[in-house]
Amino acid sequence: MKILRKICSVVLCAAVAVFMACSLAEGKEKAGALSAEDFVPADTVAVSDIIEGLTARSAVVTEMTTGRVLFEKEPQEQCECGHYAKLMVLLLTAEKIDSGELSMSDTSVVSEYANSQQGSQIWLDKGEKISVEELIKSVSAGNANDGCAALAEKVAGSADKAVELMNSRAKMLGMNGTVYTDCTGMEEGNVTTANDTALLCSELAKYKNLTPYLTCWLDTVRDGKAELVNLNRLVRTYKGVTGMKAWGSEKAGSCIAATAEKGDMSVCVVLNGCDSQEDMNTEAKKLLNLAFDTYEIYTPELPEDMVKEIVVCGGEELSVELAPEGLYPIVIPRGTYRMVECDFTAEEKLDAPVKNGETAGEIRYTMGGEVILEGKIVACKEVKKMNFICGIKKLVYNLLSM
């Protein structure tokens, strides 16, 4: 508790002063998959103070909806991938289900490759038929290697093709420190980083249909023949947890990727190389609490006097409506939203032709005099330049309206 109080004190005192340097890039759109560029390094926070007492060799704490890195320790250090690889298999599965190419009720015929898997397993027999849903359960809660192999083969057509898709998807997400050599993550050569795992979790967290499986504590598959026990103890000990995966090995130590929601915030904690499972769980809870207690989501509010319409000169219409663009929720130190100020600038007029989305002004949000978010004020639709025929029509209309 002394360590936690010290950490909270340091963070709360420093958060307002240092927050602005971590503001998100200008004009970045909120929609779409988060990439490596979306994660802003926590380089302005005294990391050594924040991570004091952690046994983890590497760690990352992010707010997933904004991509803001809150705390980090050696985030790019490569480590054994292990069961984290199964999160990528789950992501590929979720995307196939979302596109309609796969359903929970579809069945997979267990191959010799899947049957040959060692370690954590649900004891699948060669030629056995098992549903996609049961395979998802076995991978989400049970870390089953045979279940993962069978699921990967169902999704990609073969284990080799699955590895190709896994590496391709990792590249798309900006997981530059990750390499998959097999679909289960158990072979030599599978590597990842804490930062990459946070990127993967942020993408996987979008698929809410998987949450019941990722948060399941105990379950069975194969008509009760195989019992599943989730190594992520936070699914039953931390309120608001939404997944993801815990595992360990002699070489890697105890590792966890845990996600949780509280209010508007969705936080991911990744800890690699903890000294023990007990340390891993304690430190994950500590960092989740620290994130929720220290930060909050701020949704930009528009000033009441913001210009909503602008005159168009020489256009088929006399004016065009305006709207803000490029504004999205951001992370700020908790309790500082009253310090946020907003101002805007706008042109007096636009000359036709006006393009849809044409810039007519700027809007910015500041805290303590520093810009934390910037956007544009743009035209809501196209306005064509007035021609002779249009001019005659308007003249006649105005005469008839007199």
Question: Residues of each region from the PLM?
Answer:
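Sterically constrained small-residue positions within well-ordered secondary structures
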Residues: V18, I50-E52, A260, P353-V354
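Residues in and immediately flanking transmembrane alpha helices
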Residues: V18-F19, S99, T299-L302
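Active-site-adjacent loops and short helices of periplasmic peptidoglycan-processing enzymes
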Residues: A25-N195, S202-K208
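Gram-positive cell-envelope targeting signals
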Residues: M1-A33, F388, I392-M402
